[in-house]
């Protein structure tokens, strides 16, 4: 899957990430040459590669499915059915089985579940998991939601008593990213 430097630049990337990418490509300015997401991933890491999904055109289905996959990694912590429903609706939408109105309703419900979890303060883990679900549902509205879902899942793993859980979550997200957007595993 490809983007271009001009498409990335249109989305106002952070200065550090932008300069790092240009340097890795031995370039000083944006152009319209196809740029593989695997190149971005290998140069800048997962956060920037996921962020660059915002610049990819015509791949909403894959972006939504990646967001849902990330959120499903922490779905066992989702205490509110509205969050689980949002994942199901986002997945159905990506597969052409739900419409935008259904998706918007699911997104609103997941957002309300997140506020309820935050208000009840029963579990920060539940709040992060709910945030991941709501982010997945908003992928249609903004491709940036893929990063939100991935970040929520990673942050949630980071709350674990085992630091290795965060590393494992990031690794799993990178493997899935390579599979879905790059068609390959890093050897």
Can you say where each PLM-predicted feature lies in the sequence?
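Short, glycine-biased loop/turn motifs at secondary-structure junctions and
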Residues: 1-187
């Amino acid at each position: 899957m490809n983007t271009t430097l001009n498409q990335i630049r249109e989305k106002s990337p952070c200065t550090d990430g932008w300069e790092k990418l240009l340097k890795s490509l031995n370039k000083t300015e944006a152009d319209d040459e196809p740029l593989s997401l695997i190149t971005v991933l290998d140069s800048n890491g997962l956060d920037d590669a996921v962020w660059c999904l915002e610049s990819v055109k015509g791949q909403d289905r894959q972006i939504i499915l990646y967001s849902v996959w990330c959120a499903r990694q922490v779905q066992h912590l989702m205490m509110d059915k509205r969050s689980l429903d949002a994942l199901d609706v986002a997945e159905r939408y990506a597969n052409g089985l739900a419409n935008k109105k259904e998706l918007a309703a699911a997104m609103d419900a997941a957002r309300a579940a997140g506020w309820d979890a935050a208000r009840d303060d029963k579990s920060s883990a539940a709040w992060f998991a709910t945030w991941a679900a709501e982010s997945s549902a908003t992928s249609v509205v903004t491709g940036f939601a893929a990063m939100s879902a991935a970040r929520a899942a990673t942050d949630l793993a980071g709350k674990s008593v085992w630091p290795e859980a965060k590393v494992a979550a990031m690794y799993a997200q990178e493997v899935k990213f390579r599979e879905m957007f790059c068609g390959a595993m890093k050897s």
